[in-house]
């Protein structure tokens, strides 16, 4: 739009007029007081490449400016929390691991910590189990952050970080497959311990994987940290300060990007995190770039923690030594492929009838958990992942509710995006890093 300037006769200064001869200030005022009917409503998603799955964003826009932004969720609802009420306590792990599918080990650990707290066996968990849990969670944190940075880069037009991120994630998933048998949703963490011990060569494989991960992490930083285009698209975008985070219950990298060093691994340690040396990464920018830098640096801290896990990993049991809670932890996979070695079967069948009955009841009915309710929480890659668990004294949960950080953090979309541009909304949502499996459950 071409403009000209005219001097006013009263000497007050200059008046900016548009090509049509109108005063520019009057044009702006007219636009601001325009009929809301001139604004349009646009649905971004649920089928859209930039909404992280089946997230629907209902946008009211005026030109390129977002005047109102609302989230539409529920397109990935699976009824997992309700299904848990019809499954044994141990079977529940198979369901919860599928909620936030990018960080399944955190779902499993939070659930198992709650069951163990109800059982009163938190202090009886073997040291080896806690080390394995911490190690798997930190490896999972790396893989989850790599996906966040890879997809975030792709959505802003940076394709190379996507390839770098997924190449690094493949290293971690291959390691998970070697240890648990599955790349994702492994149901490896169990109430009282873990499903099986590490393979004989696991320490060597993990050390090699850490060495291989350093290259893609360095490459990701080299590509984006000082990239002028990346900084222009992320700095001062998706702004949310500490007051906003506190009002909305926001946690994770979004909260730490305001300068508050809130991390449950430090403030309320679990699984022995108090025995590990690592830093809580913060920033003071309150924007998408600060959240990006936090995730990059947190991956390096996770590598430090996993290295300490390898040093702490000592031989020992991988399940609590309580026959009323856990199956025997030293089973070997027999010819039937079900973990019943001939020696174990002979011991069960050749022992007392009571032992056989107990084993049968444990397998078919599951453990009984004393009545009560607990809340446990872990620091997932997206923030505080909490579990409110209620038991009525039976073999199944009465109620299990997950406080998923993706669900809570999505509340910040309106605060981050209203008043900004449509293109910047993509940046803001990518910096939140929501996983719809955890949002809808």
UniProtKB/Swiss-Prot annotation:
Record keywords, A-Z: Cell membrane, Membrane, NAD, Quinone, Translocase, Transport
One Pfam family linked to the record: Complex1_49kDa
Bilayer topology: Peripheral membrane protein
Molecular function terms, GO-annotated: NAD binding; NADH:ubiquinone reductase (non-electrogenic) activity; quinone binding
Compartments where found: Cell membrane
GO-annotated cellular components: plasma membrane
Domain of life: Bacteria
Reactions the enzyme catalyzes: a quinone + NADH + 5 H(+)(in) = a quinol + NAD(+) + 4 H(+)(out)
Assembly behavior: NDH-1 is composed of 14 different subunits. Subunits NuoB, C, D, E, F, and G constitute the peripheral sector of the complex.
Name this polypeptide is given: NADH-quinone oxidoreductase subunit D
Organism name: Mycolicibacterium paratuberculosis (strain ATCC BAA-968 / K-10) (Mycobacterium paratuberculosis)
